[in-house]
Design a protein with these regions (language model features):
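Active-site-adjacent structural elements that line small-molecule/cofactor binding pockets in enzymes
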Residues: 1-281
Length: 281
């Protein structure tokens, strides 16, 4: 039996063009195959067609937590503009009560203006969204203690708000940052930083410098790298599929703490499951 990759590997599973039963069944199969986490992105509409069928992130993750027993569930990543942070904290705390120690809160500033227009959600310029993110993370961390929380921020105001039962252990807050500002922000306020492999080499020095500037150590913030599978690679010919143990070890040597196979589509699932069987079977 293989001991599997040297760092955790999860799967960011498509939420477009599938139904909830398919998602839940696939999540259970990913758990059985040995994957560490199943992740959903937080969009309300597709980047292709606005009328594409699409599952909502957190309700899907709640259902996933209910039908699994080991695998972590998380957002890759939630848009800070989509929900008031106090409401999001309550949602995450509830799922964490159902699945203690298995919930991950990935959060970022968003980047899909069309869905904001469609749903009537404001979409200010990136600097304001980043400032809101900083304030939101503070609100969420405070509510994860259970409360009461009172705060008068620039955007969020709470008056003796509670989030009870408080999650134990406290879910990680992972900031998604694919630009220098995002990497710096993650280094300053997050428990984890997620970025895509295409930006990793350029952003890693920025992240490391920001960690040092914030007086934080490397062990304070997990580095989570999203890795795309080639489009149409249903046969699983990429290194992540053919030799997942060696592939993960190369990433560990480059400084990654965790990996996420990004946006795995329906026609790629069988190859991903087979790779898991080779890695952990």
């Amino acid at each position: 039996m293989s001991h599997g990759p040297s760092i955790p590997v999860g799967v960011n599973l498509t939420t477009i063009g599938i139904d909830t039963r398919w998602w839940l069944d696939t999540a259970c199969r990913l758990e059985a195959a040995g994957y560490a986490g199943v992740w959903a992105w937080d969009h309300f509409v597709s980047r292709g067609r606005l009328d594409d069928p699409m599952l909502e992130c957190w309700t899907t993750l709640a259902a996933t937590a209910a039908v699994t027993s080991r695998i972590h569930v998380g957002s890759f990543v939630s848009n800070v503009m989509n929900r008031h942070p106090a409401v999001l904290a309550r949602m995450v705390a509830t799922i964490a009560d159902l699945a203690p120690g298995r919930v991950e809160l990935g959060i970022g500033i968003g980047g899909h203006p069309a869905e904001h227009t469609a749903y009537g959600i404001e979409f200010p310029a990136p600097p304001e969204r980043a400032a809101r993110l900083v304030e939101a993370v503070g609100v969420i961390r405070a509510l994860f203690t259970g409360g009461p929380v009172s705060t008068q921020g620039a955007w969020y105001r709470l008056d003796e708000a509670y989030a009870s039962p408080a999650p134990t252990p406290v879910p990680r807050i992972i900031v998604g940052g694919e630009r220098p500002a995002g990497a710096r922000l993650a280094a300053r306020i997050a428990d984890g930083w997620s970025c895509m492999e295409s930006q990793y080499d350029a952003l890693r020095p920025v992240f490391d410098a920001a960690l040092a500037e914030a007086g934080r150590s490397r062990s304070d913030v997990a580095v989570i790298v999203g890795c795309d599978l080639p489009a149409g690679d249903a046969a699983g010919t990429s290194p992540a599929m053919t030799d997942p143990v060696a592939w993960a070890e190369r990433w560990r040597e480059r400084g990654a703490d965790e990996l996420v196979l990004h946006w795995v589509k329906g026609d790629q699932v069988e190859a991903v499951l087979a790779a898991g069987e080779r890695a952990w079977g």
